């Protein structure tokens, strides 16, 4: 164990540098605003800075921990599950995994509290069942080679059909649920499961189909919440504004964070427990990993736990009040339109601080053998989130319905999926769920809510929906990146001699379907 800890120290330094690159731009933007056009109280500023420090350390531990534990656990479980060649077992275990992981997701409780007309446990169990069912569907898609765009067209058509029967006060929360439930705990594990399942396949489509699990798992909660909204006639959602901190000294400042820590210690322990128990069963029954591998996974789980506790405490106690107050101050100015470019700037950098984004970018680079670099993925995600936050701020200032953005956005994203290489489509729809993580929920959403209060808008219809917008735009930007790459490849092929061109076409993947 000591050797494992020592070996991880150089990696921790590397992860610290990555975390600094992610968090410092956000801190710099907020500080510039605080000292120029958006003055805020010293209490809120100090909470924000201490929260930023905790987020910094949290990202450092989480990214290394997920690399050491969540990814290898998911890959091995996915591989072992597929090796059984037992369809009933894959279905039952897949559903159980999706259900247990989701039911323990901390953000799901927050979502349930926003919809008082539906009993909390009814909503939580329904959303968890939705994720479980769609995780099973994602497994079956990979095993039988079903094209992802077909499923996306089918299910998003059903979603928008159901949306016509749901009260407008409930729409934004329903669409937010898809991004909220694929949090930093579930995403790395679900993505690793996909890589493990695809690893068993020997055909050339395996890499394409190793992504797409998060995409389908994000559909389940939206459908579940929309159906519940119709069944319960859920016409109301609630907005509970964050309590703005007031501290007189450093002891009171630390007291705020110390009171929050036990809550997140408990929440993250509850989230990790189902994953650990399921892995324990796999280890005893089938995996039989050696002690060194188990020790490495155990250290990784400890890092993951510590990192997420620090991250969520810093985000909820430090970032949430600052985001809300900053939104109020900016939208309260005579030049409130400045909220749009500032929101876009914050959106560009804030996605880099999402814990699961690191896992996605690294996995994309590995699975594509460097054809899609982590840096290129990061830029595509940043551009997408920047655009989505800008559009969300337009909604806050104008009160335009979220459907005016979601219907054209998803229609365009699904339309281009028919001509974009399948790998890019799967990655893009996964990226939507990954980008809409806790940083969106604890800073961007409060920013929109604070701005909505300042302009006198309807918070439930105008401010909620930021998560849904952030989940939508990467679908377009990542696929456009794929389309550009494909056009460049075709241009290069045309420039090749005839014999080289023939060889290149011989290497193109066929449409073979895996047999169980």
Regions found by a protein language model. Name each.
Residues 14-22, 46-52, 80-91, 148-153, ...:
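Alpha-helical transmembrane segments and their helix-start/interface "positive-inside/aromatic belt" motifs
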Residues 1-19, 23, 74-87, 202-213, ...:
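Intrinsically disordered, low-complexity non-transmembrane regions of multi-pass membrane transporters
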Residues 13-19, 40-50, 82, 115-124, ...:
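Interfacial loop-to-helix junctions that mark the boundaries of transmembrane helices
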Residues 32-46, 66-74, 100-115, 134-146, ...:
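Transmembrane helix-loop junctions in multi-pass membrane proteins
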Residues 243-356:
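Transmembrane helical segments that form the transport core of multi-pass membrane transport proteins
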Residues 78-80, 87-158, 336-417:
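Helix-loop-helix junctions within the multi-pass membrane cores of secondary transporters/permeases
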Residues 24-37, 51-61, 93-100, 130-141, ...:
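Hydrophobic core segments of alpha-helical transmembrane domains in multi-pass membrane transport
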Residues 2-3, 138-153, 168-169, 173, ...:
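Juxtamembrane and boundary regions of transmembrane helices in multi-pass small-molecule transporters
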